[in-house]
Amino acid sequence: MSILTDEKLLADVAAGMSGHAIAKKYGMTPGNINRRIKRLGARGLGHGGNVSRFVPDGYKVKGTSSLVKPDGSVALQWVKTDVDAERQLKMMQEAIAALTECLSPLEEINLISRDEDTTLLNMYTVTDAHIGMLACEEEGGDDYDTNIAEHLISSWFKSATTLAPNATECLINLQGDFLHFDGLKAVTPTSGHILDSDTRFFKVVQTAIRVIKRAVNMCLEKHRKVTLLIATGNHDLASAVWLREMFKEVYCDNPRVTIVDEQSPYYAIEFGKVMIGVHHGHCSRMEKLDAVFASKFREIYGRTKFGYLHMGHYHHRKVAESNMFITEMHQTLAAKDEYSSNGGYDSGRSATVITYHRDYGEIGRISIPVEMIKDWYGLE
């Protein structure tokens, strides 16, 4: 039995033989034949090879459909393409290599604060920022878009780091739904509900990265140790993941910055005798959170005396105390979109920095309302 070369295989395919027929002819399995035909097609050979030059880079010819005249000539031809995963991976690697050529290391941020208190930790909580959301004053009482969100959140961090005590440590608690939508379509990731958006997704990504980096830099000037927690919300299920991974790489060589690396939507921080738990609020109800955290983080719960749980999701403030934890639901800085306005969901707008003592638990807080930020920084 003769050896099946690429030339023979191409000739048999051109003659109209099926994969099964070719396999029988050469004593091979049909799967083997089909894999070889696909590999040849990926190289622009065989069926559709004469049109492969018209296919964009990153794609390959999957097949062609031809309208043949009675005399055997081709009147029309349709080219069917598919993603060339190997080529697209190579293209992405080339793009990454090109981008990294012009990257320079982050400038070192020096600690400006003096007389720091090693017994304190400041927690800066911003929940439900919804960067990329569109809201208008006529409908919900105030305007909100990506540009407003960036200035509002950045100004809040500037105010909060100025007013808060000089604690040695801080926790930046971005408590979920930092981005309003999670991809190219402005819809919720799981239910597909249409969302009010004001811009393209790449601009939302750029803004989110700038805001987080700016917040970390401000905190590095004030605190010796900065912990960044990017919680997963129901609006940014995927984005929270890549944001965490990206900032892990950005600050991997900075011993003063720690990124909370937890893939479940429940997060716990231990500070002396204090346990701080964070969950966006989309997976567990408020009244259930204490049992979830006591079970999930048994060791931390057993070692600590004071327990505080924090959530968002509902955009209004509520506090409940059980035998195990004090659970707090936080307000948001974002304005009301059409959904919230039409549903009658009305609440105050603020964000809070809470100060914890490692031996005594919460000892102070500063709540900064949106109106105060607008007045201080001339925001409209």
Go through each PLM region and give its residues.
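N-terminal short leaders/motifs
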Residues: 59-72, 213-230, 277, 307-310
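Conserved beta-sheet core of the metallophosphoesterase superfamily
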Residues: 50, 220, 246-256, 261-265, ...
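Short, solvent-exposed polar/charged micro-motifs at secondary-structure junctions
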Residues: 75, 239-241, 268-272
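Short, motif-level signal for alpha-helix interfacial/capping segments enriched in acidic residues
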Residues: 103-114, 156, 289-300
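Core catalytic region of metal-dependent phosphoesterases/phosphodiesterases
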Residues: 108-129, 137, 142-257
